[in-house]
Swiss-Prot record:
NCBIfam families: folK. The keyword Kinase applies. Pathway: Cofactor biosynthesis; tetrahydrofolate biosynthesis; 2-amino-4-hydroxy-6-hydroxymethyl-7,8-dihydropteridine diphosphate from 7,8-dihydroneopterin triphosphate: step 4/4. It holds the Pfam family HPPK. The gene is folK. The keyword Transcription does not apply. Its EC number is 2.7.6.3. The lineage of its organism: Bacteria, Pseudomonadati, Pseudomonadota, Alphaproteobacteria, Hyphomicrobiales. PANTHER family: 2-AMINO-4-HYDROXY-6-HYDROXYMETHYLDIHYDROPTERIDINE PYROPHOSPHOKINASE. This is 2-amino-4-hydroxy-6-hydroxymethyldihydropteridine pyrophosphokinase. InterPro entries: Hppk (IPR000550), Hppk_sf (IPR035907). It is an enzyme of class 2 (transferase). GO terms for biological process: folic acid biosynthetic process; tetrahydrofolate biosynthetic process.
């Protein structure tokens, strides 16, 4: 099995239930074992900022799926939970991003690994640092990348 890291986000409806539902779907998928989950974090919107706040989390999984197979599973879980893609960086009931996949560097029209923006987004790095602070992405650890960003406005939800 290969270790991969996923970012979860929601800003429509019952955000906590959406994140929990995504993790449940992942855990029920053959070839995926959820090994760690961060707390949920309340975060301001990024990109298109005229929308509600987000709830974000990170998940570590062990998987037998290929990177593209994992992406397809994530997209199918999003659809099962009601995701409709209307505009880039717009509101979403659930978002599941493949952030990193151990030993894989991918760059094609469907998938870029590691995720091209992972080191630029505190809302991704804060929860990821909770479960994998020493994960190396782009030559630096998650902890080092996070130290370069401003995490203000990001609050852990108890």
């Amino acid at each position: 099995m290969t270790r991969a890291y996923l970012g979860l986000g929601s800003n429509i409806g019952d955000k906590a239930a959406m994140l929990a539902g995504a993790v449940e779907h992942l855990a029920a998928t053959p070839g995926i074992r959820v090994v760690a989950r961060s707390a949920d974090y309340r975060t301001p919107p990024w990109g298109d900022t005229d929308q509600d706040w987000f709830l974000n989390a990170a998940v570590a999984i062990d998987t037998e799926l290929t990177p593209h197979g994992l992406l397809e599973v994530c997209l199918s879980i999003e659809a099962a939970l009601g995701r409709v893609r209307e505009r880039r960086w717009g509101p979403r009931v659930i978002d599941i991003d493949v952030l990193a996949y151990e030993g894989a560097q991918v760059s094609d029209e469907r998938l870029v690994l590691p995720h091209r923006f992972v080191r630029e987004r505190a809302f991704v790095l804060v929860p990821l640092a909770e479960i994998a602070p020493d994960l190396v992405i782009g030559g630096e650890t998650v902890r080092e990348a996070l130290a370069k960003l401003d995490p203000s406005g990001i609050e852990r939800v108890e």
